[in-house]
């Protein structure tokens, strides 16, 4: 079964509405074309480190454009995004990544010290992707995110292709025990998406129909909670799938004033 998959959905949006906003954080705005192209750069890096179909790619990030870009990169080359709670300490991370066994991890510079500790306990990780947040330089064992996100020359697709059976792995927070990964088929996630725009996602994929339905930029949503939570990630995917945009706060702790200012904008 082919089924719907997010990479082709988002590529369809980027082709139809290339200049529509896709992400915004503070003064940073990313168009649908740039969102797609930057994800291609990350996807190319993933292929370069030797990933195979349905390898896991962990997002150890605060909210920001890089989170959704890296998720899209995973989908493009048939990998499984893995949400990672940025509040975890080294032991909790070692457990989570020991369970998920990611082939690659993308992380904010703020977490360098913690990652340094965990690296020795996660030898299966082939590549570490560093997102500069002004807190520390990129370590020699990692690759700078900006250096790969801006280098794509074409759309990325792995030899094994894409289909709706490929997964998204959502881990619980572990509040009632150890974190557990919930395996979602992409086609099932699409079927459960709330309708946030003009197109109705039918049982059988119809990417041409999606393109015809998109005539203008869609609605905007504000991901006020962390993208590492299913609420924010799944809502964001639903909005982006209809040509909409996702805004995130610049602060790393909840700021009601910034949130309301963003709502007004």
Language-model features: locations:
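Flexible, low-complexity linker/hinge segments
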Residues: 1-4, 136-166
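Conserved AMP-binding/adenylate-forming core of the ANL superfamily
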Residues: 2, 21-64, 68-72, 89-94, ...
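Conserved pre-ATP/AMP-binding loop-to-beta segment of ANL
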Residues: 19, 152-171, 177-178, 183, ...
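Conserved AMP-binding A3 loop
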Residues: 31-33, 167-195, 199
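Structural core segment of the AMP-binding/adenylate-forming
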Residues: 48-49, 76-150
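A short helix-loop-beta submotif of the ANL/AMP-binding
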Residues: 56, 62-82, 86-90, 98-104, ...
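Conserved S/T- and glycine-rich ATP-binding loop of Class I adenylate-forming
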Residues: 57, 74, 105, 166, ...
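Conserved AMP-binding/adenylation subdomain of ANL enzymes
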Residues: 193-221, 228-265
């Amino acid at each position: 079964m082919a089924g719907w998959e997010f990479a082709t959905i988002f590529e369809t949006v980027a082709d139809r509405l290339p200049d529509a906003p896709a992400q915004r954080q503070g003064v940073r705005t990313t168009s649908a074309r740039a969102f797609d192209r930057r994800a291609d750069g990350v996807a190319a890096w993933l292929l370069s480190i030797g990933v195979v179909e349905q390898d896991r790619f962990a997002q150890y990030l605060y909210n920001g454009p890089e989170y959704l870009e890296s998720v899209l990169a995973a989908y493009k080359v048939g990998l499984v995004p893995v949400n990672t709670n940025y509040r975890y300490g080294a032991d909790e991370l070692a457990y989570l990544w020991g369970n998920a066994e990611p082939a690659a991890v993308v992380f904010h510079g703020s977490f360098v010290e913690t990652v340094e500790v965990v690296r020795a306990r996660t030898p299966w990780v082939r590549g570490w992707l560093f997102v500069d947040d002004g807190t520390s330089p990129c370590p020699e064992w990692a690759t700078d995110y900006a250096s790969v996100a801006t280098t794509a020359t074409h759309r990325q697709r792995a030899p094994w292709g894409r289909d709706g059976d490929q997964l998204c792995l959502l881990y619980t927070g572990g509040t009632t025990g150890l974190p557990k990964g919930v395996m979602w088929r992409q086609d099932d996630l699409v079927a459960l998406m709330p309708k946030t725009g003009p197109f109705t996602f039918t049982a059988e994929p119809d990417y041409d129909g999606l393109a015809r339905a998109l005539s203008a930029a869609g609605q905007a949503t504000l991901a006020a909670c962390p993208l590492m939570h299913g609420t924010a990630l799944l809502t964001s995917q639903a909005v982006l799938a209809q040509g909409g945009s996702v805004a995130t706060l610049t602060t790393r702790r909840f700021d009601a004033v910034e949130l309301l200012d963003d709502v007004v904008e």
